[in-house]
Amino acid sequence: GQHHDASTGAVMPPVYQTSTFVQTSPGQPLNPDYEYSRAANPTRTALENALASIENGTRGLAFSSGLAATDCVLRSFKAGDEIIAMDDLYGGTYRMFTRIYKDSGIKFQFVDINDLETFQSLINENTKLVWVETPTNPLMKLADIAAIAQITKANNILFAVDNTFAT
C-alpha cells in the first residue's frame, strides 16, 4: 500500500524531478538508495512498491519503455530455453526476439495463439515462457488470456502478457 509522509502527512508521494542527489563526497551518496535518477529515485520506488502491493508481490519494477521491460524478462532465460510467442507482435518486440536474441541460444516459436491445439503441440520440456500481446499492434488481434493461462499453469510455464496497446 501507500504510506503517508511522516513529515508532512501527505498521503501521496511527491514527484521528485531531480537527476542527482547529495553526496557526502564523490561516490558517497547521503542516502545509499539514491545517487542518480537513472538508477533509482524516490518517485519510481513509490510506483514500484505500489505495483508490488496491488499484485501481492514482493517487488515491482518500472521501466522507461516496454522494450526495456521485455529485455529484462528475456534475460531470465538461457541457451536451450524455448519461448512460444504470438505470430502477431509489435515490430520492436518481434525484432528483439528474432535479431537481438538471435545468437542467445533461446529458441522462439511463433504461433497463432488462438489455435490452442497447435499452440499446445509446441509445448515441450524446454518451453519456459509464453509471450502474448493483446490486443496486438497494429492488427488488434485478441488472445484468450484465460485459456492460455490455464494451459501454461498446467504445464508450469511462465506467461507474459503485453497489453501496451490497450493502455
Task: Label each region the model flagged.
Residues T20-D71, S76, G92-Y101:
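Conserved N-terminal alpha-helix of the aminotransferase class I/II PLP-enzyme fold
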Residues L61-T167:
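Conserved PLP-enzyme active-site core in the AAT-like
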Residues T8, I54-E55, S104, N155:
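Residues at alpha-helix termini
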Residues G1, S19, I113:
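Active-site donor-binding loop signature of nucleotide-sugar glycosyltransferases
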Residues P14, R44-E48, I145:
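A general structural signal for well-ordered alpha-helical segments in protein cores
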Residues G1-V11, V15:
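Short conserved active-site loop signatures built around small residues
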